[in-house]
């Protein structure tokens, strides 16, 4: 049972005391969202992946309710033990198109970290997504300075160099209205 909850932080060291404090609070908050049920770990009904996003980048309250319900149902119905949760702090240096498991970059727009949940059966799950990805053994990282072109189907078509992350937000919003 000692290995049931293994929390790991990967990436850069906190830049200052304020960032260190926020990371500590975040990990405590994440742990509180996992509650053991009959020797298994399930997400509390109050769990909302949007809470993992910085406040100024968080979607409006109520946004993505359907995706949230699918996400929680998918995880809780798996009835597997959560063996670890790895928090990878997002840094410049890795491309949106290099995400493990073919993840949709739209799931991570605005996030400052990626949380990887590892279950007994092996899938990796991204917060805010109802998709389950098979493990690849790679860390999930994202480069906020490497914008990509995403078509109306959410597929990466090519990279746009020199565009701001705000422009990527705008492009995704345009695609959502098509």
Question: Where are the model-predicted features located?
Answer:
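C-terminal and inter-domain tail/linker signature
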Residues: 1-178
